[in-house]
Amino acid sequence: MPELPEVEVSRMGITPHLLNQTIQSLIFRTPKLRWVIPSELKKLQGQVIRHIGRRAKYLIIETDVGSAIVHLGMSGSLRVLDADFPAGKHDHVDLKLSNGKVLRYNDPRRFGAWLYAAPGEDHDVLGNIGPEPLTNAFDGQYMFEKAQGKRVAVKQFIMDNKIVVGVGNIYASESLFRSRILPTRATMSLSAEEWQRLVSHIKQTLQTAIEQGGTTLKDFSQADGKPGYFAQELQVYGKAGEPCPECGEAIQEQKIGQRNTFYCSYCQC
C-alpha cells in the first residue's frame, strides 16, 4: 500500500506538469473505485489547477470551483503521459490537460478513491485526523501527552491517524527499530525521552523515504514510472528470519493489530 512518502513523491512528481494547466476533460472508465466517483468532479473541466496539496495519504488537486481528492488505496499510482498514450486494463481515470499531457490513475485492486470537495470545504475523509508527521506540531511532548493511560501496543498507536497521519506499516516497523523500541510495548510505558527519540526517527525515516522516491515493494511507481528506492534502506521490514543488521540475531515477525510487524527482540526493548 502506498504510504505517506509514496503519496508525497507522487505529489512532487505531478506538480510541475499540472500546476497552472487547464483541465480539458475528465474521463472515468469505471463508476466506482472504493466509493462511487462523484459526478461533481465534472465541474473541474475547463478549470485551471491552482495548487496540488497533500493531507495524510490524500492528494488534493485544487481549482477555483472545487478540488479533486485522490487516494491511491492498496495498489493505485499516478503517471503523467502524452495525451494520446493508450489506456491499459487498470487505467480508470484520465485528467487531460492543456499542455498535451494526461494524468492517468491506475489501480488494479480498485481500493483507491476520487472524491470532490467544494471550495473552502474539507471532505469528511479529512476530518478528525492528527497532525502531519513532518511538521512542528508532531513532537515528543505531543506524543507523550497523548500516550498517557493508553495500553495499546506502541506500533498500533503511531499508526492511528487520529494521533498522527501517515505513519504506515513499513515506516512504523522501521522507525521503531531505529529507535530500539519494541513494537509490542504498551504506549503508556514509553518515557518522554523515548517518545522524543521515536518521533525523531519517524521524521528521519519518512524524509529519507521521500528523498529516495518512496518504497516499491509491488505496485507503487513514481509519476514518471520509475520505482522508489527506499526498499534498499529497509532494515527489518519484510526480513523475518534474516540476521539483524546490528546484532546478527534473527529478525522476528508478529501480527500486531492484524498487521505484519518486524523487529529484533535483542536490540529492541
From Swiss-Prot:
Q: Which reaction does it catalyse?
A: Hydrolysis of DNA containing ring-opened 7-methylguanine residues, releasing 2,6-diamino-4-hydroxy-5-(N-methyl)formamidopyrimidine; 2'-deoxyribonucleotide-(2'-deoxyribose 5'-phosphate)-2'-deoxyribonucleotide-DNA = a 3'-end 2'-deoxyribonucleotide-(2,3-dehydro-2,3-deoxyribose 5'-phosphate)-DNA + a 5'-end 5'-phospho-2'-deoxyribonucleoside-DNA + H(+)
**Which GO MF term does the entry hold, naming one?**
class I DNA-(apurinic or apyrimidinic site) endonuclease activity
Residues in FPG-type zinc fingers = 235-269
Q: Which InterPro entries match?
A: DNA_glyclase/AP_lyase_DNA-bd, DNA_glyclase_Znf_dom_DNA_BS, Formamido-pyr_DNA_Glyclase, FPG_cat, MutM-like_N-ter, Ribosomal_uS13-like_H2TH, Znf_DNA_glyclase/AP_lyase, Znf_FPG/IleRS
Q: Per UniProt, where does DNA bind?
A: H90, R109, K150
Q: Which cofactors?
A: Zn(2+)
> Function of this protein?
Involved in base excision repair of DNA damaged by oxidation or by mutagenic agents. Acts as a DNA glycosylase that recognizes and removes damaged bases. Has a preference for oxidized purines, such as 7,8-dihydro-8-oxoguanine (8-oxoG). Has AP (apurinic/apyrimidinic) lyase activity and introduces nicks in the DNA strand. Cleaves the DNA backbone by beta-delta elimination to generate a single-strand break at the site of the removed base with both 3'- and 5'-phosphates.
Q: What is this protein called?
A: Formamidopyrimidine-DNA glycosylase
Species name = Vibrio vulnificus (strain CMCP6)
The coding gene here is mutM
